[in-house]
Amino acid sequence: MRCPFCNSVDTSVKNSRPSDCKMSVRRRRSCDSCNSRFTTVEELLLKPVKVLKKDGSVEAFDRQKLLTSIILATKKRPVTRDQIDMVVSNMFYKLEAIKGSVVPSGVIGGMVMESLFALDKVSYIRFASVYMNFSDVNDFSGIVERVQEVV
């Protein structure tokens, strides 16, 4: 691994540990030339995930798009960035495991809703309002009633 500070290739691993989701390894490294320390993350690369859109088109899965939508739904809620990152990582690994790796966008939306329901009910309702294209107050009251039944 090349040192990001001096570009030397003489580096050594000082500490390794698996991530919380056990799908990556975090390594603490030290440069033997300049003695700088830096961290790397090693992840398993699986086949790329493709998303089948509602209009029939297929596009590459965009992890950043998913992250942005969840951050927007959880804005000003008691949800940490670490929790959001964990949701996105877990979803990404589940999607990679699907055979064929062409996943309908509805499956991804359902996975987000399921994750947000477990994480924060208000965030779940916010996401659902956009994902399910709510058009009036009755749509909101219907989903709020369903959430209250579970709680």
Swiss-Prot record:
Which cofactors?
Zn(2+)
Molecular function per GO = ATP binding; DNA binding; zinc ion binding
Pfam families with a match to the protein in the record: ATP-cone, Zn_ribbon_NrdR
Q: Does the keyword Cell membrane apply?
A: no
Q: Where are the zinc fingers (unnamed)?
A: 3-34
Q: Which GO terms describe its biological process?
A: negative regulation of DNA-templated transcription
Q: Does the keyword Repressor apply?
A: yes
Q: Where is the ATP-cone domain?
A: 49-139
InterPro entries given in the database record: ATP-cone_dom, NrdR-like_N, RNR_NrdR-like
Paste the cofactor note.
Answer: Binds 1 zinc ion.
UniProt keywords, alphabetically: ATP-binding, DNA-binding, Metal-binding, Nucleotide-binding, Repressor, Transcription, Transcription regulation, Zinc, Zinc-finger
The text of the family note is:
Belongs to the NrdR family.
- Stated role: Negatively regulates transcription of bacterial ribonucleotide reductase nrd genes and operons by binding to NrdR-boxes.
Name recorded for this polypeptide: Transcriptional repressor NrdR
